[in-house]
Amino acid sequence: LLCHEMIHNWPMMDDSVTGTATWYNEGCAEYYSTMLPLRAGFASTEYEAVQINEKLGERYYDNPLRELSNMELARVQWQDRRGQVVPYGRGMIYLANTDAELKRAGKPSIDTIITSYNWDIQITLENWENFIRENLGEEGIRKFEEMKSGKLIIPDPDAFDGKFEFYEHEVEKDGITMTSYRCRAK
């Protein structure tokens, strides 16, 4: 939790229209609070697998509201607490998948654009879309639009620097059986 909150001092996108950038602000905090300790050698892949499962499981993959759009989530988040946490997991897996796609294509990682901006000089949706279009083309923009619309994001096998193996996991929430995902260290 402390690492998550510390990350909020760095990547920031204007979310004054709640829902437009919650995925980015919370997704970055979740992604980097997982990856930075791992990359620095402060945490093991086994420990971070537990963290990823907690962050992506209950907040996103096991959440009955997971397929609401970002803007729909913003509208319901104060009536249904589950709506508040979807952008954390959705943003995290979107960023992890996007980073994997960029690396496979031999392009700059998400670290490149995210570290180019900070609290004082905030990234905008336009900056993000330009970066995605320039490096991943219209296919990257399509996936970005799908993320915003609430389409379920399937984990990329190379997400999180390729250090984890993802597998399907069935869960039941509110009487509904859903396909979820979990990971384990490779």
Where do the PLM segments sit?
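Soluble non-cytosolic domains of exported or imported proteins
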Residues: L1, G19-W23, V85-I93, R104, ...
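Zinc-dependent metallopeptidase catalytic helix centered on the HExxH motif
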Residues: L1-Y61
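Acidic helix/loop microenvironments that form the catalytic cleft of cell-wall polysaccharide enzymes
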Residues: E26, E30-S33, S109-Q122
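Short glycine/serine- and small hydrophobic-enriched flexible loop segments
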Residues: Y31-L38, I93-R104
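Structural helix-adjacent loops and short alpha-helical linkers that scaffold large soluble proteins
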Residues: P37-A49, L102-I110, N135-K143
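Secretory-pathway/luminal and periplasmic proteins that interact with or process carbohydrate-rich
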Residues: L38-F42, Y60-D62, W119-E126, I154
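Long, well-structured alpha-helical subdomains associated
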Residues: A43-I93, W128
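Beta/coil-rich, acidic/histidine-enriched accessory regions frequently appended to metallopeptidases
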Residues: D120-K186
